[in-house]
From Swiss-Prot:
UniProt keyword terms in alphabetical order: Glycosidase, Hydrolase
Gene3D superfamilies, per database record: 2.70.98.10, Galactose-binding domain-like, Glycosidases, Immunoglobulins
Entry-linked InterPro entries: B-gal_small/dom_5, Bact_Beta-galactosidase, Beta-gal/glucu_dom_sf, Gal_mutarotase_sf_dom, Galactose-bd-like_sf, GH-type_carb-bd, Glyco_hydro_2, Glyco_hydro_2_AS
SUPFAM superfamilies: (Trans)glycosidases, beta-Galactosidase/glucuronidase domain, Galactose mutarotase-like, Galactose-binding domain-like
Example GO molecular function: beta-galactosidase activity
Protein name per Swiss-Prot or TrEMBL: Beta-galactosidase
Record-annotated active site: E458 (proton donor), E546 (nucleophile)
Family membership noted in the UniProt record: Belongs to the glycosyl hydrolase 2 family.
GO terms under biological process: lactose catabolic process
Record organism: Streptococcus thermophilus
Recorded catalytic activity of this chain's protein: Hydrolysis of terminal non-reducing beta-D-galactose residues in beta-D-galactosides
Gene giving rise to this polypeptide: lacZ
CC terms in the record's Gene Ontology section: beta-galactosidase complex
Pfam short name (any one): Bgal_small_N
Length: 1026
């Protein structure tokens, strides 16, 4: 075959997954001497990262066929940074699709056919001179991550071919190197048969996106290493099994091993390599401390390869001793039932895509630890090696997932239709499946943090995936196997050791936990579960490998899931997902915005569905983390006026690392704080007396106990708050108008009330409050109007609420005042507007304004309830005040936005913020900034002029934003929210929850909805600050 024929053969044959690649192996480092090891830099590794030359072809017809030859003229080639995605450096355009394949509707294809019209080819060239340390040795090249398929040439010689975008592709190139300048040429094809296996829900970005480096090996080299640190939780002894394979001149060589930590050597010894270059050592009864996410204790294993007692290679490995097993249908870590407080995580950076840095990883892992997240699923591909090292070090449990997803071959528009799904049980796809399983296992097997192997994601089920599971079990008896897809094809239920589901509702999960009922989703939409077989009790431990679809303003009802921890077989879940996948794009005016699918004219696209993170794409925190942090905490605190009850859900650690701060607040103002140290053993609960320092008062009192770090850790400073508990002795204002003589002007069109430094106008024509002027400053820009609806959230749209509740939007915007009731007395003015709602017969809403001699405005809105109508999102008033009033303080539940189904983690207190900061910049603008249970709030300018709003008789909900509901609703991106000439205030009797079960049909749970059959009353007071 000529080169063109060879390329087409490799691209189009699913059985060919690699040519001339090095066998997958462990990711360990190695050094030629102890001195080099102590310095920490591998001299036998030479980075090729940096500027490369490139030619980009839109399809295979435009490719540079001879670019790899040494005599090729490279003058006209462009430049590109490696690692980095093509599309983010001007070569091609990003495309976001979820389930559908990127060519859907453009080319009609079925597996294993490969797109032709859009199969872009990037031809890379890099020149290098071999470092002296690598000369006269076997030399290899390693591509840590390339999407999708890669051909490699050195000095015009074809080296090899490889697939699997997310694990290393390595080739030996020793025979092709020359003295001086060497030419490396790499052709990266966007599509091959491998593309059918990489249909993950992410931006389709291609190119060389992870490190590229050369490496050489010593004359005898530990090529592969499997280290297993077992912990016997009954004897509390460790066992270390070392299995390694050497290559080169290994005859008569010894391996010296030293296991140690900062306290000294645990064990040491040596053993000889056998005739096949292999060695196996088992070291028992080791006095060690176990590894867990709570206490990620690591030991240093140093292997010395000895040649006549001379060190010729040093191999360091971090070892964590732990035993993860399924016993009596429970997953146990070191003998204790584990609960995953997990999150799914894509590798993502808003500027560089999946080409992320160690800085990104450190930020991610610290944020996870700071918010009580203890587990991560590498959705849906193996991550960079450094991530696993950090998880070992910082303490995170990892479900390591193979690079396999074929969602678009069997699920269409939410319906299961597997007529042409792959890999199924097709022999031609088995080599690729096993290759991907092997690549992941071999590289990641030595990481203590990896406790479960996952066969992939959303690829239905069949014998090919069953063979992957069998492979994992055959090579590793220390980790169970996970695969969710069997829920769609129960014939292959044996693939997974864990009952794993996606987006199962709390009631469905509870049904499994109490009856053992299995579901088979194959004949129904993925929104609902079909009936299954009763087994009376669960046969496997349960996790939700994906749940709480946190798209936009979401995360409501998380407590309904964490409440299931009372069932032993419920072992947690993994929120979808960690970070918004949004890419910075430049507007014509030079400013940047975070783009989503479709913004690059990418078609087909799944648009804003890429914004599901609990952190924003720019790595700032979303308000959703407030709830996650509280509910994921292993420390639970319940408070009353005299004591605190603390439950320690840690598996292994007591509370000696924490300080507890007991505080008392009166009307939200701290009046006392005392420090305590409580001793609660892991898994236990205890109640302690607390001497809350409090004086007799008519104020509302808050009794609070906060748990904070006693000392700084790697992931948080001293004093970092873990969680807190509160007990509130509620006292809401019952203020009433003060009766005193008023100056009232009863005009034909307006009722005017005037007093010292104030004037109020209530309009007969506009049927609302039109002016509130204090100290000569006008506050009302747009008078209050009824509000029954909000700027719909992603979850609202997914559940069909804009359609279902459309009548309420009309009702709020176009209500008609049918009666204006005016009561004027010498010391009192009260005006009531009676609203009739369009399309809703016999429904009235009364809004009353009463003004007293101090200029205070008492506002009441009443909705009496009407059976048979759709629910509404909210009930209250929306109006606008001057744009200069941007400073916001409130006494309510914060510090982030709060909703009735997102209250855990929102604590009652006084908070200072601004109108700008209280609006969360979700990828698509939507409802945001609500504060539940508010007693009062103020909005002011920089001169302390402003208004104070006080709840009467019952706390209200409110928001103060830069834009109106309508403006937010109409915007598709944050930059489309133009600078407003007003500050928009909403004061609400109630707002429904935001939901979070999923974003494609799940309603807000009934207990968090607002029934139109119920009555609602809003009552509050407006007064000037000065």
């Amino acid at each position: 075959m000529n080169m063109t024929e060879k390329i087409q053969t490799y691209l189009n044959d699913p059985k060919i997954v690699s040519v001339n690649t090095v066998d997958a192996h462990s990711d360990h480092k190695y050094f030629e001497s102890l001195e080099e090891f102590s310095e920490g830099e591998m001299k036998l590794r030479q980075s090729l990262n940096g500027k490369w030359k490139i030619h980009y072809a839109q399809n295979t017809n435009q490719v540079l066929k001879d670019f790899y030859k040494t005599e090729f003229d490279e003058t006209d080639l462009n430049f590109i940074n490696v690692p980095g995605h093509l599309e983010l450096q001007g070569f091609g355009s990003p495309q976001y699709v979820n389930t559908q394949y990127p060519w859907d509707g453009k080319e009609f294809l079925r597996p294993p056919q490969v797109p032709q019209e859009s199969n872009a080819v990037a031809s890379y060239v890099k020149h290098f001179t071999l470092n002296d340390a690598l000369k006269d040795k076997k030399v290899f090249i390693s591509f840590q991550g390339v999407a999708t398929s890669i051909f490699v040439w050195v000095n015009g010689n074809f080296v090899g071919y490889s697939e699997d975008s997310f694990t290393p592709s390595e080739f030996e190139i020793s025979d092709y190197l020359v003295e001086g300048d060497n030419k490396l040429a790499v052709a990266v094809y966007r599509y091959s048969t491998a593309s059918w296996l990489e249909d993950q829900d992410f931006w389709r970005l291609y190119g060389i996106f992870r490190d590229v480096y050369l490496y050489a090996i010593p004359k005898v080299h530990v090529q592969d290493l499997f280290v297993k640190g077992d912990y016997d939780y009954q004897t509390k002894a460790g066992q270390l099994d070392i299995d390694l394979k050497t290559v080169g001149d290994y005859e008569d060589k010894k391996i010296k091993y030293v296991l140690s930590d900062y306290e000294g050597i645990v064990t040491e010894g040596d053993a000889s390599v056998n005739g096949d270059g292999e060695l196996s050592v088992s070291l028992e009864n080791l006095k060690i401390k176990p590894w867990s996410a709570e206490s990620p204790k690591l030991y240093d294993l140093i292997l010395h390869v000895l040649d006549d007692d001379q060190v010729v290679e040093v191999v360091p490995v971090k070892v964590g001793f732990r035993r993860f097993e399924i016993k009596d249908k429970l997953m146990l870590l070191n003998g204790k039932r584990i609960v995953f407080k997990g999150v799914n995580r894509h590798e993502f950076n808003a500027r560089t895509g999946r080409c992320i840095t160690e800085e990104d990883m450190l930020w991610d892992i610290k944020v996870m630890k700071q918010h009580n997240i203890n587990a991560v699923r590498t959705s849906h591909y193996p991550n960079q090696t450094r991530w696993y090292e950090l998880c070992d070090e910082y303490g995170l449990y990892v479900i390591d997932e193979a690079n396999l997803e074929t969602h678009g071959t069997w699920q269409k528009l939410g319906l299961c239709e597997p007529s042409w799904n792959i890999p199924a049980s097709e022999p031609e796809w088995l080599p690729a499946c096993l290759d991907r399983a092997n690549n992941m296992f071999q590289r990641d097997k030595n990481h203590a943090s990896v406790i479960i192997w996952s066969c992939g994601n959303e690829s239905y089920a069949g014998k090919d995936i069953a063979d992957m599971a069998d492979y994992f079990r055959s090579v590793d008896n220390t980790r169970p196997v996970h695969y969710e897809g069997v829920a769609w094809c129960r014939e292959f239920d044996y693939i997974t050791d864990i009952e794993s589901r996606m987006y199962a509702k709390p009631a469905d999960i509870e049904e499994y936990l109490t009856t053992g009922k299995l579901v088979d989703l194959s004949s129904v939409s993925d929104k609902h579960f079909a009936s299954g077989n009763l087994t009376n009790k669960p046969q496997k431990p349960y996790i939700s490998c994906e749940y709480m679809h946190t798209m936009g303003n979401s995360g409501g009802g998380l407590q309904l899931y964490t409440d299931l921890e009372k069932y032993p077989e419920y072992q947690g879940g993994f929120i979808w997902d960690f970070i918004d996948q949004a890419i910075y794009k430049t507007l014509p005016n030079g400013s940047e915005f975070l783009s989503y699918g479709g913004d690059w004219h990418d078609r087909p696209s799944d648009y804003e569905f890429c914004g599901n993170g609990i952190v924003f794409a720019d790595r700032t925190l979303t308000p959703k983390l407030q709830t996650v942090k509280h509910l994921y905490s292993n420390i639970k605190i319940a408070v009353d006026e005299k004591s605190v009850t603390i439950k320690n859900d840690n598996l292994f650690e007591d509370l000696s690392a924490y300080t507890f701060l007991a505080r008392v607040y009166e009307d939200g103002r701290k009046v006392s704080e005392s420090e305590y140290h409580f001793d609660v053993k892991p898994g236990e609960e205890a109640t302690f007396p607390v001497n809350f320092v409090v004086e007799a008062s008519n104020s509302e009192q808050i009794y609070e106990v906060a748990c904070v770090l006693r000392e700084a850790t790697e992931w948080a400073p001293k004093g970092h708050e873990i969680v807190r508990g509160q007990y509130v002795v509620e006292k809401i204002s019952t203020e009433t108008p003060v009766k005193a003589p008023l100056n009232v002007v009863e005009g034909d069109f307006n009722i005017g009330i005037q007093g010292q430094n104030f004037s109020i106008l209530l309009s007969r024509a506009q049927n609302t409050l039109v002016s509130a002027k204090y100290n000569g400053v006008e506050f009302i820009e747009k008078g209050p109007k009824l509000s029954f609806t909000r700027a719909y959230t992603d979850n609202d749209r997914g559940a069909g609420y804009p359609f279902e509740m459309a009548g309420w939007k009309v009702a709020g915007n176009y209500s008609k005042v049918t009666d204006t009731q005016i009561q004027i007395e010498d010391d009192s003015v009260k005006v009531t507007y009676v609203h009739e709602l369009p399309g809703l017969s016999d429904v009235e809403v009364k809004v009353t304004y009463q003004v007293d001699y101090k200029g205070r405005i008492f506002v009441t809105a009443n909705y009496d309830g009407k059976a048979g109508l759709p629910n509404f999102p909210e009930f209250g008033l929306e109006f606008a005040i001057g744009s200069q009033f941007t400073n916001l303080s409130y006494y309510g539940y914060g510090a982030e936005e709060s909703y009735r189904d997102k209250l855990p983690g929102a604590y009652l207190g006084r908070y200072e913020t601004s109108v700008e900061k209280t609006f969360a910049p979700y990828l698509m603008p939507q409802e945001s900034g609500n504060h539940y249970g508010t007693r009062e709030f103020t909005v002011s300018d920089d001169n302390h002029n402003g208004l104070k709003f006080t709840a009467l008789n019952k706390a209200f909900e409110f928001s103060a934003l830069r834009n109106s509901t309508e403006q937010i609703e109409n915007a598709r991106h944050q930059y489309e929210l133009q600078e407003s000439d007003a500050t928009w205030i909403k004061v609400l009797a109630a707002q429904m929850g935001v939901g979070g079960d999923d974003t494609w049909g799940a309603p807000v749970h009934d207990e968090f909805l607002l029934s139109s059959a119920d009555s609602y009353q809003l009552s509050f007071m407006i007064e000037p600050l000065n």
